[in-house]
Amino acid sequence: MTIDLSKRSYQKELLDRDDIPFGDIRRNMFELDVINTWLGGHAISISGLRRLLSGRKDVRICEIGCGGGDNLRALVRWCHKKHIRIHVTGIDHNVHCIEVAKERWKDGEAQWIHSDYRHVTFGREKPDIIFSSLFCHHFTDEELVFQLRWMEANAGAGWFINDLHRHYLAYQSIRWLTKWFSGSYLVKNDAPLSVLRGFTRGEWQELLRLAGIDGSRIQWKWAFRWLISKSFLVE
């Protein structure tokens, strides 16, 4: 089978449908947490957070597309080890994901918002840091330009994005890993497709240019991830 990696795929993932039974979504979220733990996805988000902290010991952080809250949990536990006080907000348009996040949260106070992130306003209580993880590849380029501008306008200290590098080795590796080790039909279908919906460095550079954003940093991270970040503080 020939795979075209020259441009992003816009084929919809199963998880983007509205008729998926929630038990299947729950299984999908559990496996994604395992994948992020073992393949370094959470470590990349921690790296993004560390860059933007700039020595502060009290931080407000918001994740858009938070799912079941696994990424926020990883960041909170890291902050606790570093004696950093962290206030978290998770936003997701899927009410079932918000319910799971609330159910599984054991790490102190958190605010969970069931909404499309585009409809959320913070007023004077802006989060210091806004981030997303494996969220951007669900959107078109036009939608991502809006998303970048939204993050730029609503974060107080900066923002970061953790998402997939579209690469042949990444595609084949996740296809075989999920074929043999996943029990979720959603993960088996969506994980390889997610890579095809991922990005190259040049595409991120163009998206940032279209959004009118200067001073951001694009870093390649193992395993086949991009960490895009912008600090509003002088470095």
Descriptions of predicted regions:
Residues 22-48, 52:
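Class I SAM-dependent methyltransferase Rossmann-like catalytic core
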Residues 62, 68-71, 75-119:
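Class I SAM-dependent methyltransferase SAM/SAH-binding core
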Residues 131:
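A conserved beta-strand element that flanks and buttresses the S-adenosyl-L-methionine
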Residues 164-211, 217:
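C-terminal alpha-helical "lid/dimerization" subdomain adjacent to the S-adenosyl-L-methionine
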